[in-house]
């Protein structure tokens, strides 16, 4: 099966103070009919990430209907765990409550950063507010270095999270051994980690696996994630329980374009179904510097 690219949907114009560059980590939220809000992370003039959104019409290839001027979430107060930026991981809806999970960026001295995971909550359509000034998934003996992009789903009465974790630090930011791990929660804010690694590509040509996206398909869990050696590509895996994964390698149905906005790398996949079709949002060159686009799965 192949993904047919529908083209780039959005790239920042540089006019908004919180979105001077980049549109990374797109996450869809259905509004009504064929209308979706696509959340993404943009960067300001100081390279700090905020979480914003665009409104699109999927019936016409993701045509943009609106670009809200204000972001959903800005970096935290000075000294907080997310004061250097916030990057979206996922959104979970539980009745009238929405939980937005994100990576909180915190730059360091001896290493580039020591990131953790936070959550912001919206009740009955109100603006998102941080649940706490502290992370909900923090560094500890299991994850001593840095965390990244959480993906959360509700599975029965359990919240399940797959997230990225550094195994250490390389000589540069392109040489970071990074794996995907797992935690679970009863309420979505208090999390219990497992003592194992679930996706590890560090023994291959790829030093880092990150930004997991998980769906449950007819009793089978499917994960898309991005991994990189020199450049990011999109990979996939399957599991019967969401814990033990069979890594299938690169998703051969989608790759970089010969000469376009996504000719150097494709990353941060987010897969969703609508009106009997399966779509993929993904970011392009430069970790989303050129924006994000849309593809549809063809049998």
Swiss-Prot record:
InterPro entries: Glyco_hydro_beta-prop_sf (IPR023296). It comes from the Bacteria. SUPFAM superfamilies: Arabinanase/levansucrase/invertase. This is Uncharacterized protein Rv1502.
């Amino acid at each position: 099966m192949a993904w047919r690219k529908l083209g780039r949907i959005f790239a920042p114009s540089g006019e908004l103070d919180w979105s001077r560059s980049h549109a990374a980590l797109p996450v869809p939220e259905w509004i009504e009919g064929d209308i979706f809000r696509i959340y993404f992370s943009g960067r300001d003039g100081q390279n700090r990430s905020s979480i914003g959104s665009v409104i699109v019409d999927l019936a016409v290839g993701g045509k943009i209907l609106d670009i809200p001027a204000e972001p959903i979430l800005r970096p935290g107060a000075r000294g907080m765990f997310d004061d250097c930026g916030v990057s979206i991981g996922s959104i979970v809806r539980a009745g009238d409550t929405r939980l937005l999970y994100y990576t909180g960026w915190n730059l360091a001295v001896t290493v580039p950063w020591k990131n953790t995971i936070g959550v912001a909550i919206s009740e009955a359509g109100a603006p998102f507010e941080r649940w706490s000034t502290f992370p909900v998934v923090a560094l500890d003996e299991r994850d001593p270095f840095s965390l990244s992009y959480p993906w959360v789903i509700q599975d029965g009465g359990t919240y399940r999270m797959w997230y990225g974790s550094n195994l250490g630090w390389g000589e540069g930011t392109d040489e970071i051994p990074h794996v995907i791990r797992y935690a679970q929660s009863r309420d979505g804010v208090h999390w219990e980690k497992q003592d194992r690694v679930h996706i590890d590509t560090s023994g291959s040509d790829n030093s880092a696996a990150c930004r997991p996206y998980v769906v449950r398909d007819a009793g089978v869990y499917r994960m898309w994630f991005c991994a990189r050696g020199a450049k990011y590509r999109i990979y996939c895996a399957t599991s019967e329980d969401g814990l033990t994964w069979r890594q299938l390698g690169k998703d051969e149905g989608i790759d970089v374009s010969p000469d376009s906005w996504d000719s150097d790398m494709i990353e941060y996949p987010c897969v969703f179904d609508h009106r009997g079709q399966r779509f993929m949002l993904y970011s392009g060159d430069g970790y989303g510097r050129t924006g994000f686009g849309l593809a549809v799965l063809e049998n």
